[in-house]
Amino acid sequence: MSKAVVVFSGGQDSTTCLVQALSQFDEVHAITFDYGQRHSEEIEVAKALTSELGCASHKIMDVSLLGELAISALTRDAIPVSHELMDNGLPNTFVPGRNILFLTLAGIYAYQLGADTVITGVCETDFSGYPDCRNDFIKAMEQALNLGMDKQLNIHTPLMWLNKAETWALADRYGKLELVRNHTLTCYNGIRGDGCGDCPACHLRKRGLEDYLSNRDAVNAELTKKTGAN
């Protein structure tokens, strides 16, 4: 029996990954992390989506220590989300160590479940400047987990080379475009669906959807070229 663990936030990307995983694996488990994030409503959204989509289990893990250590606009309500980059060239929504911690814990969970695949929705094409969304990081993390647990564990990143329009097309391929559009939470300000319309996450999501809806055939053709599936 094939098993996978999906790192699941209830946002557009991780929901698209979950939908795809449910069609590809016999047993899919979701894991959501509560780190005191600004958009904490995403945890309730994640609960609702995993229930509706039918995961084998949904684990919510308290990692509030990350929120205490990592100072970011996503962990401090007093820090407004900015469209400008910080002095280090990163957005102020970057949470240092987040994906290192998430993938480590998801890997441990997969080990206990007997799953050999961890799925995460990180993307280098539209990665907002986050270094822990790069393919080089994922490969290094995969190697570290394999060595550290003496287990063959695959970190699968189905969105790594897709742009946002292609991610919308992937959700549509599985018949879940409207679910992703109306019931996920990507907005940094915690508003479901189309979100606040002002934060960087909302801008990226909206632009991708508009690109897809106005160029469906071309976007689907590019998606097929990248994924090798119809």
Swiss-Prot record:
ATP binds at F8, S9, G10, G11, Q12, D13, S14, T15, T16, C17, L18. Its cofactor is Zn(2+). Keywords: ATP-binding, Ligase, Metal-binding, Nucleotide-binding, Queuosine biosynthesis, Zinc. The keyword Coiled coil does not apply. Binds 1 zinc ion per subunit. The keyword Ligase applies. It catalyses: 7-carboxy-7-deazaguanine + NH4(+) + ATP = 7-cyano-7-deazaguanine + ADP + phosphate + H2O + H(+). Pathway: Purine metabolism; 7-cyano-7-deazaguanine biosynthesis. SUPFAM superfamilies: Adenine nucleotide alpha hydrolases-like. Signal peptide: none annotated. One of its GO terms (biological process) is queuosine biosynthetic process. InterPro entries: QueC (IPR018317), Rossmann-like_a/b/a_fold (IPR014729). Belongs to the QueC family. Catalyzes the ATP-dependent conversion of 7-carboxy-7-deazaguanine (CDG) to 7-cyano-7-deazaguanine (preQ(0)). This is 7-cyano-7-deazaguanine synthase.
